[in-house]
């Protein structure tokens, strides 16, 4: 009985000592360095220029500039929040040159 009690106390102390949900590789907060949007809590890995480091950023709100979601997962402009659509250039040239920015609209 005494061993069971000690084991229970050890298990509880380990459970309380475990770190919170903050991640090192995934579940990153806004402003932390990222390589892909899947790593960010917000769902957007953003960089301002080709030479800048990408950081997690909030998704674009209504009437803000946006980029359509891509398979690459790193954006110059973040995609729209849930329920909004990015209305803008949908050409192949725009997606190749990364100039296919639009505006988030509630359609």
UniProtKB/Swiss-Prot annotation:
Q: Name one GO biological process term.
A: digestion
Task: Establish whether keyword Aminoacyl-tRNA synthetase is in the entry.
Answer: no
Query: What is one Pfam family matched by this protein?
Result: Colipase
Gene3D superfamilies from the UniProt entry: Lipase, subunit A
- Any idea where this protein resides? Secreted
Q: What is a single molecular function from GO for this protein?
A: enzyme activator activity
Where is it predominantly found? secreted
Q: List the disulfide bonds.
A: 34-45, 40-56, 44-78, 66-86, 80-104
Q: What residues does the annotated propeptide cover? A: 18-22
Q: Where are the transmembrane segments?
A: none
A single Gene Ontology CC annotation of this entry is: extracellular region
Q: Which residues form the signal peptide?
A: 1-17
Q: Which UniProt keywords apply?
A: Digestion, Disulfide bond, Lipid degradation, Lipid metabolism, Secreted, Signal
Q: List the InterPro entries.
A: CLPS_chr (IPR047576), Colipase (IPR001981), Colipase_C (IPR017914), Colipase_CS (IPR017915), Colipase_N (IPR017913)
Its job: Colipase is a cofactor of pancreatic lipase. It allows the lipase to anchor itself to the lipid-water interface. Without colipase the enzyme is washed off by bile salts, which have an inhibitory effect on the lipase.
* Protein family according to the UniProt entry: Belongs to the colipase family.
Name of the protein in its database record: Colipase
Q: Which organism is it from?
A: Oryctolagus cuniculus
């Amino acid at each position: 009985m005494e061993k069971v009690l000690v084991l229970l106390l050890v298990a509880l102390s380990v459970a309380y000592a475990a770190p919170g949900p903050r991640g090192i590789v995934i579940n990153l907060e806004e402003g932390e360095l990222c390589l892909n949007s899947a790593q960010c809590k917000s769902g957007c890995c953003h960089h301002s220029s080709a030479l800048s480091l990408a950081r997690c950023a909030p998704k674009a709100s209504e009437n803000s500039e946006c980029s359509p979601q891509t398979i690459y997962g790193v954006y110059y402009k973040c995609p729209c929040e849930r329920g909004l659509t990015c209305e803008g250039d949908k050409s192949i040239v725009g997606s190749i040159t990364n100039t296919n920015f639009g505006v988030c609209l509630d359609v």
